[in-house]
Amino acid sequence: MNIRVIYHSSKSGNTQKLAKAVAEELGVRAERMGKDSIVFAQPVDLLFVGDGIYWAKPHRITRRFFEELDPAPIKNAAVFATYGNQFKIGDDLRTLLQGKGINVVGEPFTCKGASVGTKNQGRPDETDLQNVRAFAQQMAALVK
């Protein structure tokens, strides 16, 4: 099964922590939007997409990625995200994927991330990372 993990993460590294945990759990590499050259040369059975929330919406790099995304090679997707105060980011990412005609499996995985002005310092923590690893396995099992 061809599984890919792509994400955007700010300087805080919250979403990057989740992306690396998902990738390690599934034995693949996490690729960063806006930094890595992300090409879908072969069909993707399951694409994990991760982001944080920036001024109540996905980051502009993530939105641009979706604008340019050719959905043809992507069979299924799953969403993970971090948030400071507004937890709807998972639903926003799911909507972007579905808007491209991509099947989104399961419910988005979201957890708090360290953010200025919140009580989320130290998040995502080890429990969050264990939970996102379990999420990765569950989503992969849905598309086997």
Predicted regions: what they are:
Residues 3-4, 10, 16-17, 21-33, ...:
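FMN-binding flavodoxin-like domain, especially the glycine-rich phosphate-binding loop
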